[in-house]
Amino acid sequence: MAAPRAPRALTAAAPGSGKAKLTHPGKAILAGGLAGGIEICITFPTEYVKTQLQLDERANPPRYRGIGDCVRQTVRSHGVLGLYRGLSSLLYGSIPKAAVRFGMFEFLSNHMRDAQGRLDSRRGLLCGLGAGVAEAVVVVCPMETVKVKFIHDQTSSNPKYRGFFHGVREIVREQGLKGTYQGLTATVLKQGSNQAIRFFVMTSLRNWYQGDNPNKPMNPLITGVFGAVAGAASVFGNTPLDVIKTRMQGLEAHKYRNTLDCGVQILKNEGPKAFYKGTVPRLGRVCLDVAIVFVIYDEVVKLLNKVWKTD
């Protein structure tokens, strides 16, 4: 009869045991929230440009000729701070989003690791999928809906939202809570696939780098490079879902019956290239985003391990 499987503790194994250190979900929530807040302050301008290009539909005709033109027009009309319009709505969402993502990932992965505390790539993908779905439902969908509506409103000739909280009140007053959950299906698909790809790549690269020693220290530079690779993979893997999600959450979402109809209309009216509109600015943002988040997350966890002992 096989011996019972050794229990998995949430503390570091004794030196020389070869068992991987596990991260307490509470630490993951704190570290993830901090990493998410810092990252969004650095990368928001590229997110703003990406959203503008995706909302700049061909049928209008287009307002911008490209990334550079979008930046020039924004700075000319609103100054450099114009590239940060809508930051508050994304910042309020980014902190809890990263907290939920990493907290859920560590919670799931701590129950899916082998007796040595290692997480293989396949299980890393599943844990990433679970983390992505959790952040989509709890945080991303309502916050992204408000963000897209706010940015879209500010570019109209008669903006009606005076700020983030005023925008939220108006959206809820006019459309109810349902108004903050537009594009939920697309968001769940997008975030789920996003984090599944990122954590799959990150887990694979970590396992390759650490080899037979799961506790081999990760240099922040190496973590950043791995994070950038994971981010790039997620961009090429799910940009079409990101485009559909943005359309479903914009002020003209009423044009589409559902997520599938949105995709069909984009393909029919604008062609397949429309699904990759905004890819270049998104690629730059996401690679930097994921690299920053993983580096800060890992470093904060290391610090927390010194001051917060978990059993």
From Swiss-Prot:
GO terms for molecular function: antiporter activity; citrate secondary active transmembrane transporter activity; citrate transmembrane transporter activity; tricarboxylic acid transmembrane transporter activity. It is found in: Mitochondrion inner membrane. The chain crosses the membrane at residues 29-46, 86-105, 129-143, 183-202, 224-241, 278-297. Solcar repeats lie at residues 23-111, 122-208, 218-303. Belongs to the mitochondrial carrier (TC 2.A.29) family. Residues 1-13 form a propeptide. One of its GO terms (biological process) is mitochondrial citrate transmembrane transport. Its main location: mitochondrion. The modification Phosphoserine is found at residue 156. This is Tricarboxylate transport protein, mitochondrial. PANTHER family: SUCCINATE/FUMARATE MITOCHONDRIAL TRANSPORTER-RELATED, TRICARBOXYLATE TRANSPORT PROTEIN, MITOCHONDRIAL. Gene3D superfamilies: Mitochondrial carrier domain. Possesses a short cleavable presequence, which, however, is found to be dispensable both for targeting to mitochondria and insertion into the inner membrane. However, the presequence is required to keep SLC25A1 in a soluble state and thus in an import-competent state. Mature SLC25A1 lacking the presequence is prone to aggregation. Mitochondrial electroneutral antiporter that exports citrate from the mitochondria into the cytosol in exchange for malate. Also able to mediate the exchange of citrate for isocitrate, phosphoenolpyruvate, cis-aconitate and to a lesser extent trans-aconitate, maleate and succinate. In the cytoplasm, citrate plays important roles in fatty acid and sterol synthesis, regulation of glycolysis, protein acetylation, and other physiopathological processes. It is a multi-pass membrane protein. One of its GO terms (cellular component) is mitochondrion. InterPro entries: Mit_carrier (IPR002067), Mitochondrial_sb/sol_carrier (IPR018108), Mt_carrier_dom_sf (IPR023395), TXTP-like (IPR049563). Keywords: Antiport, Membrane, Mitochondrion, Mitochondrion inner membrane, Phosphoprotein, Repeat, Transmembrane, Transmembrane helix, Transport. It catalyses: (S)-malate(in) + citrate(out) = (S)-malate(out) + citrate(in); citrate(out) + succinate(in) = citrate(in) + succinate(out); D-threo-isocitrate(in) + citrate(out) = D-threo-isocitrate(out) + citrate(in); cis-aconitate(in) + citrate(out) = cis-aconitate(out) + citrate(in). It comes from the Eukaryota.
